Amino acid sequence: MAAKDVKFGNDARVKMLRGVNVLADAVKVTLGPKGRNVVLDKSFGAPVITKDGVSVAREIELEDKFENMGAQMVKEVASKANDAAGDGTTTATVLAQSIVNEGLKAVAAGMNPMDLKRGIDKAVIAAVEELKKLSVPCSDSKAIAQVGTISANADETVGTLIAEAMAKVGKEGVITVEEGSGLQDELDVVEGMQFDRGYLSPYFVNKPETGAVELESPFILLADKKISNIREMLPVLEAVAKAGKPLLIIAEDVEGEALATLVVNTMRGIVKIAAVKAPGFGDRRKAMLQDIAILTAGTVISEEIGLELEKATLEDMGQAKRVVITKDTTTIIDGEGDKALIDSRVTQINQQRDEATSDYDREKLQERVAKLAGGVAVIKVGAATEVEMKEKKARVEDALHATRAAVEEGVVAGGGVALIRVANRIAELRGDNEDQNVGIKVARRAMEAPLRQIVANAGEEPSVIANKVKAGEGNTGYNAATEEYGNMIDMGILDPTKVTRSALQYAASIAGLMITTECMVTDLPKEDKPDLGGAGGMGGMGGMGGMM
């Protein structure tokens, strides 16, 4: 086991504080509408330019191991805020830096660190309650667009795109961000249910110009089995032919003579048919077939529940207004399913999602909800260069997380104003002793830090503007983009309550641990042993050959 280097008391805290400040100073320059960029060198490829706090934090490793421990703890604040709300990483870092700096000053002045921490925790619990009272619901498209714009560093096109996507696929819908191919941002929306399975035979194609199969008002046969024998399908085919409608077959597989017969029937124009494999595998396939059945008001023909294909009737078929099948995807548009049944299925899947333990399962369940509840939107980010594309994509993803958080818990006034109002509201809060009161003051002072940093990044004097904002009422604050005072909510400067709350809670949690640190332990640096470079000189002995 390697020897350890141990530091105690003030020596340890000074080193740790230096690490905290290096990381926080690098991150906080990105805060606010006039935040600056940070350039990150990569070991391969072009440098990355970013205004995303957590991306900057993740890059920082310090040479001094004690300082690095401080930096890594603040990095944890940014990561936790990012995981919880997807945004607010820079705010969380600024809050943590302020609490640690003020807290360690109090410790150096002889305060009890444990009481300080208790005071900070008390203040944060009270502040979170006040934040919830200030919060207003975020439901209309305009507010959603404003939240997206603020989070994407005042990029209005991004905010509008996200609001448009949410309007089209609903709050439960899946919105993904991809790299586009042009210079403009684009929004693609797939309405209805789409899954990644294409037609089983190109002979089903009836729109050669697009290479797709389009079926208008088809019957949909759902079978949880392989179909290889045409005999068991004949009753269904005859009934469908009589009804004069097309038929879509979704089964585990359709092969052999069954597939050949379906192709022949289609080519002769006897009945319009298309067959696709059911999406997913194993239990997930069964669940997705059931989803499609509920969406189209059909029944899954499964031998597990005693239903046989030969005895299937038109009553068991699902129906939809339109189905489009390409070689890779199938889209069912406007299923005939009962709205109440679809809603109860969505509730059931949401319940499973909340209980799921793995991220993969959660993601798949969320996709199923989206497919049932509204659809899937893809935002394609456009940019002129690779570097700009990466930077913009990260911003759009942040903005998307922020708007989701806003829809979930509502919004408060942005620009650091909500925290200042909250700090004023808890001015009368008292702890059990004087040291706890100092802890409460430390937390209240920290709540001003985000506004001060936004103002500093805009090139103004933080104290002057902070005092003016403190003297104001309600949502009155300072708009750093236009350099004027006004109602933040009317100006469209909003922060999701969840983002502000998470930033404050995680910052206080980790800063509290740092204030109560009394000892730090790390490995001693290994001494480099001198290499045996001198031994190479022995090669000269080759000259002895001349002595022979």
From Swiss-Prot:
Keywords: ATP-binding, Chaperone, Cytoplasm, Isomerase, Nucleotide-binding. One of its GO terms (molecular function) is unfolded protein binding. It is found in: Cytoplasm. Its EC number is 5.6.1.7. GO terms for biological process: protein refolding. Disulfide bonds: none annotated. It is an enzyme of class 5 (isomerase). Transmembrane segments: none annotated. It catalyses: ATP + H2O + a folded polypeptide = ADP + phosphate + an unfolded polypeptide. GO terms for cellular component: cytoplasm. ATP binds at residues 30-33, 51, 87-91, 415, 479-481, 495. Belongs to the chaperonin (HSP60) family. Forms a cylinder of 14 subunits composed of two heptameric rings stacked back-to-back. Interacts with the co-chaperonin GroES. Together with its co-chaperonin GroES, plays an essential role in assisting protein folding. The GroEL-GroES system forms a nano-cage that allows encapsulation of the non-native substrate proteins and provides a physical environment optimized to promote and accelerate protein folding. NCBIfam families: GroEL (TIGR02348), PRK00013.1 (NF000592), PRK12849.1 (NF009487), PRK12850.1 (NF009488), PRK12851.1 (NF009489). PANTHER family: 60 KDA HEAT SHOCK PROTEIN, MITOCHONDRIAL (PTHR45633). This is Chaperonin GroEL. It comes from Sodalis glossinidius (strain morsitans). The gene is groEL.
